[in-house]
Amino acid sequence: MSETAPAASSTLVPAPVEKPATKRRGKKPGMATARKPRGFSVSKLIPEALSMSQERAGMSLAALKKALAAAGYDVEKNNSRIKLALKRLVNKGVLVQTKGTGASGSFKLSKKAASGNDKGKGKKSASAKAKKLGLSRASRSPKSSKTKVVKKPKATPTKGSGSRRKTKGAKGLQQRKSPAKARATNSNSGKSKMVMQKTDLRKAAGRK
């Protein structure tokens, strides 16, 4: 009996099942920029608009809305916010309601709020002036830092030295002229002596 080798059992290895790639939800480009920027706070815009008005009786709600719209605030969408802000500001004492009731009527700044706005404007203007002065000084400083070559003035002869020189020259001229005068006087005196002698001789001859 020939022994037959057992046939190698063919073992089938199951292929690895690939899991479907799960897509991660990433932020879409432009999502961060798509968010609307925060609008201006109405509680700050209303006092600023009222401070610009020069009406003693206050500003009406319609005029206030026009001023807010001119400042870039969306009045139509935020109508309810404007009314709530007006009520809050009146309760806090920032605004005074001169006409009407509730959110309708006319409003103006209280004396305390008006004085605070004036002080803030004064501080801002003073700081702006200080900055301008600092810039102007800084711009002028490089020019002044340049060393200027100072030319030495020529020594001008003083009047005293000139007068001294003139007096010295005059004295020298007088000294030079004086010998000639002395000679002239000597010659004149000699001539006069000769004349006197001649006259004496003539007188003596006449007497003889």
UniProtKB/Swiss-Prot annotation:
Identification of the protein by name: Histone H1t
Residue numbers spanned by region Disordered: 1-39, 93-208
Residues annotated as site: Important for nucleosome binding properties: 54
Keyword field contains Phosphoprotein: yes
Gene: H1-6
Function summary: Testis-specific histone H1 that forms less compacted chromatin compared to other H1 histone subtypes. Formation of more relaxed chromatin may be required to promote chromatin architecture required for proper chromosome regulation during meiosis, such as homologous recombination. Histones H1 act as linkers that bind to nucleosomes and compact polynucleosomes into a higher-order chromatin configuration.
UniProt biased composition (Basic residues): 121-134, 143-154
Keyword entries, A-Z: Chromosome, Citrullination, Developmental protein, Differentiation, DNA-binding, Nucleus, Phosphoprotein, Spermatogenesis
Residue ranges, compositional bias (Polar residues): 1-12
Family the entry assigns: Belongs to the histone H1/H5 family.
Basic and acidic residues composition bias: residue spans: 199-208
Database matches in InterPro entries: H1/H5 (IPR005819), Histone_H1/H5_H15 (IPR005818), WH-like_DNA-bd_sf (IPR036388), WH_DNA-bd_sf (IPR036390)
Domain of life, per lineage: Eukaryota
Principal location listed in the UniProt entry: nucleus
Annotated positions of the Phosphoserine modification: 9, 141, 163, 178, 187
One Pfam family from the record: Linker_histone
A GO term for molecular function: nucleosomal DNA binding
Keyword presence, Oxidoreductase: no
SUPFAM superfamilies assigned to the protein according to its UniProt record, in alphabetical order: Winged helix' DNA-binding domain
Entry's Gene Ontology BP terms: binding of sperm to zona pellucida; cell differentiation; chromosome condensation; flagellated sperm motility; negative regulation of DNA recombination; nucleosome assembly; spermatogenesis
Result of altering residue 54 to K: Increased affinity for DNA
Every H15 domain range: 38-111
GO cellular component terms given for this protein: condensed nuclear chromosome; nucleosome; nucleus
In-chain residues carrying the UniProt-annotated modification Citrulline: 56
